[in-house]
Regions:
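Post-Walker A helix-loop "phosphate-sensing" segment adjacent to the P-loop in P-loop NTPases
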Residues: 171-178
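Conserved nucleotide-state-sensing and coupling region of NTP-binding domains
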Residues: 179-257, 419-422
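Pre-P-loop entry segment of helicase/translocase ATPase cores
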Residues: 1-149
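Signature of the SF2 helicase/ATPase Hel1-core->accessory helical subdomain module
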Residues: 268-353
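RNase H-like, metal-dependent nuclease domains and their acidic two-metal-ion catalytic environment used
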Residues: 2-17, 23-24, 31, 35-38, ...
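Metal-dependent DNA phosphodiester-chemistry modules and their immediately adjacent helices/loops
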Residues: 206, 332-360, 565-583
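Walker A/P-loop
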Residues: 145-168
Length: 583
């Protein structure tokens, strides 16, 4: 998926996924592309669809006979069963092609394993195009050396937990010394929903050739961890020789605590329902977990975050920070997103109706959801809740439900949606004020910088030469006072007493009333920063005032900035309150 091939290129939510050429798979053992052909259920296109491959007839009976004969002859194999085992391991490791309504369709090895052998409480999974795309996206993340994994958000009951289970199991059950970890919104959820239902339930239905030797000391059904170790033997049993190889790999679950896996090497990690986790900041927890997936700066493990989003006061706000930090379209010089993750959203209208080929009927689903929305139009709180639980867009997934809101939650959500998801560069200019050509007391210009201390309203044309200032000798007077005014809360001390908090200096510029301006009575410039010395702050405020050509009102108990302006010849930039004789 990650490496370019001669096969089809699919664009999936910002990732360029490369499929093998039709009928070809990449053999993970030989590290070469090899032909496997394309399975056809029928020669007729309309009768070509996914049908779970069946094991040989009387499989269990034949396997029991083979097992019995192997007790006296360890080299005995049933050729039919052996061919089936080799076939299924090949497909699990390398993938599978089949014809679907006349279209050659490629399944990743993990997706094939999920469809064919990962039995749920309702039976084996159906083939669905959204799942196909999910496993493509996941495989890309697994192969990408710059990715820590993926973060998935969609509506309820879409199989997120069981897909997380097969993701955990796959590598851990076929490689040595692999460690997998699980966290959910509570310890009980990690144990009962992910470990027991998403992992152990399907695990117990697997054919024996996909089940490594595991520790059954506490019973055939693991309750606290899945250990691919030989059972500890005691007493006379210590003398019994067991020739089977143990992988010495483990899958555990832990509480939602931020440091539960701190210091642990993780090769696979699942954070289930991370948008519902209360009392724990999942964004900050990820800062701990990500280092469990790395060794000396190299990524050695992959994670899968899954959730449906709940109210912001129930963990959603922290999840939104993690989501925003996982934008695959925004990467640093090392090729990574801020979180190391890539994000994946599945809209509700792709989850409701499917044809026999696995394609969602999006128009029918949209109409269904829109009918439901229209029926709730007279109850804005109920409508907001319904939209959030069945979102068409990621913005809707983060809508506030409005249970405790006194106002129209639909209008509030639409307004929040319009501003919350705007990027920084769409809202303001960020940078610093500097003296043009380094000439002090000359022209001030604005230099844009991602690390700048000043934020200026996007509508302000910062590339123009503002500087409405009158200079007479060494004295300066602002001449744009009818349009703008500034204010600041300074600090005078470079060092504070031990244990005291160092407050930031603050400065703002305000556009006065102007009937012809869209910026009338609007704050247009912000500065909240504490430079190393107070003089640097004073100079920043001076340059800001010069750029806009306006007066500045300073807190009158901080005399340092007043003296600085007076010493520099900018006393007339200082504003006096009405009836006040001092600045």
């Amino acid at each position: 998926m990650y490496t370019k091939t001669d096969g089809e290129l699919l664009q999936l939510q910002g990732l360029s996924c490369y499929l093998p050429e039709e009928g070809m798979v990449f053999n993970n053992v030989t590290q070469e592309f090899e032909s496997r052909g394309i399975f056809r259920r029928s020669s007729l296109d309309d009768k070509q669809f996914w049908e779970r491959p069946q094991p040989p007839g009387d499989y269990l009976k034949k396997r029991q006979k083979e097992f019995t004969l192997q007790k006296s002859d360890p080299n005995h194999v049933d050729l039919e069963l052996q061919n089936y085992r080799v076939q299924e391991w090949d497909r699990r490791m390398n993938g599978f092609w089949f014809m679907n309504n006349g279209k050659p369709t490629y399944l990743t090895g993990l997706h094939y394993f999920y469809l064919t052998h990962w039995m749920l409480d309702t039976g084996y999974p159906d083939f669905r195009i959204p799942d196909l795309e999910f496993f493509y996206f996941l495989q890309y993340c697994i192969e990408d050396p710059h990715s820590l994994g993926m973060i998935e958000c969609t509506k309820r009951r879409q199989g997120k937990t069981v897909r997380a289970g097969v993701f955990l199991y796959d590598l851990t059950s076929r490689a040595k010394n692999i460690y997998g970890g699980i966290q959910s919104k509570t310890l009980e959820d990690a144990k009962n929903n992910v470990f027991a239902k998403g992992l152990i339930l399907p695990f117990k239905q697997l054919p024996d050739f996909f089940v490594p030797v595991y520790d059954t000391e506490k019973g055939q059904t693991p309750k606290s961890e899945l250990r691919f170790f030989k059972q500890n033997k005691r007493g006379k049993n210590q003398e019994i020789y067991d020739p089977r190889t143990e992988l010495e790999s483990t899958i555990t679950f832990k509480s939602s605590d931020m440091y539960a896996y701190d210091g642990t090497k993780l090769h696979r990690y699942v954070a289930d329902e991370c948008g519902k986790t209360k009392d724990i900041d999942v964004f900050e927890r990820h800062q701990v977990v990500q280092f469990c997936l790395q060794l000396d700066g190299e990524i050695i493990g992959k994670c899968l975050y899954t959730t449906t989003v709940e109210e912001m006061d129930s963990g959603g706000e922290d999840f939104q920070r993690l989501w925003e930090a996982s934008n695959q379209d925004e990467r640093n010089a090392n090729g990574r997103t801020k979180s190391g993750l890539y994000r994946y959203f599945l809209p509700a209208f792709k989850t409701l109706y499917y044809d026999k080929y696995g394609y969602p009927n999006e128009e029918k689903a949209k109409q269904y959801y829109m009918n439901e929305r229209e029926s709730l139009e007279d109850d804005s709180k109920a409508l907001a809740s319904y939209i959030r639980k069945n979102p068409f867009t990621i913005e809707e997934a983060f809508w506030k439900e409005g249970e405790t809101c006194l106002f129209d939650s639909i209008k509030i959500n639409k307004q929040l949606e319009s501003i919350t998801w705007m990027r920084e560069k769409d809202l303001f200019h960020r940078g610093d004020f500097v003296w043009k050509d380094g000439k002090r007391d000359g022209m001030v210009e604005f230099k844009q910088s991602r690390k700048g201390k000043f934020y200026i309203h996007k509508a302000i044309p910062v590339d123009l030469e503002w500087n409405d200032v009158d200079k007479k000798g060494t004295k300066f007077t602002p001449t744009n006072v009818s349009k703008f005014v500034a204010g600041c809360d300074p600090f005078d001390h470079n060092v504070v007493a031990s244990g005291s908090r160092m407050s930031n200096g603050a400065g703002y510029v305000y556009a006065k009333y102007d009937a012809n301006s869209d910026l009338s009575e609007t704050f247009i410039c912000e500065y909240i920063h504490r430079p190393q010395t107070s003089d640097i702050f004073y100079e920043d405020m001076l340059k800001m005032s010069v750029f806009f050509g306006c007066k500045i009102l300073v807190e009158n108990n901080k005399i340092g900035i007043v003296k600085y302006f007076q010493f520099r010849g900018y006393e007339k930039f200082l504003m006096k309150l009405p009836k006040s004789k001092t600045f």
